[in-house]
């Protein structure tokens, strides 16, 4: 039973098989998501103001946090759907 306990604790601690889910688009009906590929452990939201109440927004999975464009902003996070 000690061996079984150690195996269970190891699996829980390693969190084997976990895949991050990030938002890729938003609409009035909700959000569209994707499961991130291996090595992509960050969700991002990159937005830039294009005019009054008009923004160009990109969302998705990434391995590294992207840099903001001129006059743009970036949010990076690492929990499911954190980039709404």
From Swiss-Prot:
**Keywords annotated in UniProt:** Disulfide bond, Secreted, Signal, Toxin
Name under which the protein is recorded: Venom protein SynTx
Question: Which residues constitute the signal peptide according to the record?
Answer: 1-19
Q: Which organism is it from?
A: Dendroaspis jamesoni jamesoni
GO cellular component labels: extracellular region
Q: Where in the cell is it found?
A: Secreted
Disulfide-bonded cysteine pairs: these are 22-43, 36-61, 65-76, 77-82
According to UniProt, the tissues expressing it are described as:
Expressed by the venom gland.
Free-text function comment from the UniProt entry: This protein shows a synergetic toxic effect in that it enhances the toxicity of other toxins.
Gene3D superfamilies, per database record:
CD59
SUPFAM superfamilies in the record, alphabetically?
Snake toxin-like
Q: Which domain of life is it from?
A: Eukaryota
Name the InterPro entries on file.
Answer: Cytotoxin_Cobra, Snake_3FTx, Snake_toxin-like_sf, Snake_toxin_con_site, Toxin_cobra-type
Q: Name one Pfam family in it.
A: Toxin_cobra-type
Q: What is its main location?
A: secreted
Which family is annotated?
A: Belongs to the three-finger toxin family. Short-chain subfamily. Aminergic toxin sub-subfamily.
Assembly and partners are described as: Homodimer; disulfide-linked.
**Entry keyword Electron transport:** no
Q: Name one GO molecular function term.
A: toxin activity
């Amino acid at each position: 039973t000690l061996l079984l306990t150690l195996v269970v604790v190891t699996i829980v601690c390693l969190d084997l098989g976990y895949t991050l889910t990030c938002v890729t688009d938003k609409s009035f009906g909700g959000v569209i998501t994707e499961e991130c590929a291996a090595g992509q452990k960050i969700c991002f939201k990159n937005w830039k103001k294009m005019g009054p109440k008009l923004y160009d927004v990109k969302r998705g999975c990434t391995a590294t946090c992207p840099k903001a464009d001129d006059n743009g902003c970036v949010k990076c996070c690492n929990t499911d759907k954190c980039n709404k």
